[in-house]
Amino acid sequence: MIDFKAVIAKVATGASLTRDEAANAFDAMMSGDATPSQMGALLMGLRVRGETVDEITGAVTTMRAKMLTVAAPPDAVDVVGTGGDGSGSVNVSTCTSFVVAGCGVPVAKHGNRALSSKSGAADVLNALGVKIDITPDHVGRCVAEAGIGFMFAPTHHPAMKNVGPTRVELATRTIFNLLGPLSNPAGVKRQMIGVFSRQWVQPLAQVLQNLGSESIWVVHGSDGLDEITLSGPTAVAELKNGEIRTFEIGPEDAGLPRAPADALKGGDAEANAVALRAVLEGMPGPYRDVALLNAAATLIVAGKAKDLKEGVALGAQSIDSGAAEARLKKLIAVSAAA
């Protein structure tokens, strides 16, 4: 049993926790062995000082050890944003996921309801007719039969219930906003992760390097978007062959036009579902372009495309052939089947 008071005292001096100390502290929180005051103190102490790569790695190790897992092929990918970018945009990573699945890459998408926006991945999928509150085995069947499955975070991370009330009361970003995308219940080794702040691009790539991921892009748009943006450059940290490389990309690198950030303004779940379906049905415009751009990056991560332009061409084929929309229809059917 960890001495939680000693952990708080250490953080209060400005010192960093070791990976093991962080893992044990988060185990205490998620097991219900820490009081709400203790949890709030530690979460805010870490937030104010700035969470380290070792602290995040330790916390993720505990999250992963406690989650309910899903069976998925070794080449499965996840496209996920941390959320919390305050943009109120359409659901980019969700749309991107269907485009990628339509290219024949299995997608095991992890997500939740909106925390800060009007429509998170779970909200828009629910509005599209996908059943989201299904068992881990059922999600595995979706990935196997539909080529895409959605893992609703509360179902797969039941231990989070001990931390939930404290997070709600704090009502500000904590380390948990970073942990969700790093704790995919299907254990995917290939991911496209969007983050709400540029300061986290390289550290999250380092965390995933520590945890043995194979192929990762961590991205942050210059306009604040937790995706690759159309309005300007996007910062990228790429993990490949155990090495991390950082660079910037723009839509022109993919042969796509720029568009202002407000061209991607979204609405509630129903409005965003209508917009997403329109993209899968072939409607041109900025939403299609941003989905193609993010799909192109994901296809590079998956080893399907050698560069962004090839990825965009494959993504366009996925939409225009009807393959992407077929993945959505199949997911609706398989998720509804008992």
UniProtKB/Swiss-Prot annotation:
This is Anthranilate phosphoribosyltransferase. Pfam families: Glycos_trans_3N (PF02885), Glycos_transf_3 (PF00591). Binds 2 magnesium ions per monomer. It catalyses: N-(5-phospho-beta-D-ribosyl)anthranilate + diphosphate = 5-phospho-alpha-D-ribose 1-diphosphate + anthranilate. InterPro entries: Anthranilate_Pribosyl_Tfrase, Glycosyl_Trfase_fam3, Glycosyl_Trfase_fam3_N_dom, Glycosyl_Trfase_fam3_N_dom_sf, Nuc_phospho_transferase. Catalyzes the transfer of the phosphoribosyl group of 5-phosphorylribose-1-pyrophosphate (PRPP) to anthranilate to yield N-(5'-phosphoribosyl)-anthranilate (PRA). Anthranilate 2 binds at R167. Mg(2+) 1 binds at S93, E227. NCBIfam families: trpD. The lineage of its organism: Bacteria, Pseudomonadati, Pseudomonadota, Alphaproteobacteria, Hyphomicrobiales. Anthranilate 1 binds at G81, N112. One of its GO terms (biological process) is L-tryptophan biosynthetic process. Belongs to the anthranilate phosphoribosyltransferase family. Signal peptide: none annotated. It is an enzyme of class 2 (transferase). Homodimer. GO terms for cellular component: cytosol. PANTHER family: ANTHRANILATE PHOSPHORIBOSYLTRANSFERASE. GO terms for molecular function: anthranilate phosphoribosyltransferase activity; magnesium ion binding.
